[in-house]
Amino acid sequence: MIAQISDLHVRQPGELIEGKVDTFACLSACADRINALPQRPDIVIASGDLADSGSPAEYRRIRSRLDQLTMPYYVMPGNHDSRAAMREVFGNTPALPTAAGQTHLQYAIELPELRVLCLDTLDEGKEGGWLCIDRLDWLQGQLAASARPTMLFLHHPPFDCGIPGMDAIKLGNPDALAGLLAAHANVIGLACGHVHRSVFTTWAGIPACICPSPAHQIHLDTRSGTPLSWTLEPGGFLLHSVDAERLTAHVVSGPTPLATPYE
């Protein structure tokens, strides 16, 4: 089982999103919830926008909390992140197992029932994402190397979510990714972030989802021409499980009251 968290947007102490959202407190509550799950995830993947401004100090703060997870965790970049600062803080840890000399932060995780490929869609200085030829070649090589069931994690969705302001800053070259994946039937799912909402769809014939943020969410408004708005809907994370027959994803929102058995 994989716990996916995304869009943490952690800032320095005392710095709140829009003057209201303590994103570090939201991350702490999320991590506590994951540690308390009755079914222990094998790993946690933080799928981008870990920091809000990409400073080393923010990543040190994030690491101080993620290090308290009781299972291994991995980090990926989003459009708010800095590769250099992530390498500085996570580069010598299992959380960022990139190869020496590798420009982009991409890597594979081997689990007993599943292979996970984490992609780097960061396009420096832009809100939208991109997969350059080097990153696509890396993915092609990884998919050619193994026929095991494989799940892809990437920050920017390659598909529309229906919110115009977010669709304008999705992955910029989804057709290149779709064309590559068409030759690999062992890719059983895609998991994304970026949108700050839970979304489920099928893209290029593959089940795909978007993870909510543990902090603020993007307001659900599908009308064209409307500005992006944020909302204090409950934050959450996703739990992905896979067996011989299916990939299943659950949305975990919180905090919630303790479960009470039926009488």
Task: Enumerate the language-model features and the residues they cover.
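Active-site environment of divalent metal-dependent phosphoester hydrolases
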Residues: 11-13, 52-57, 79-87, 124-127, ...
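A cross-domain feature marking catalytic cores of carbohydrate-active enzymes
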Residues: 48, 77-79, 121, 154-156, ...
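Active-site-proximal beta-strand elements of phosphoester/diester hydrolases
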Residues: 1-12, 113-123, 151-153, 206-212, ...
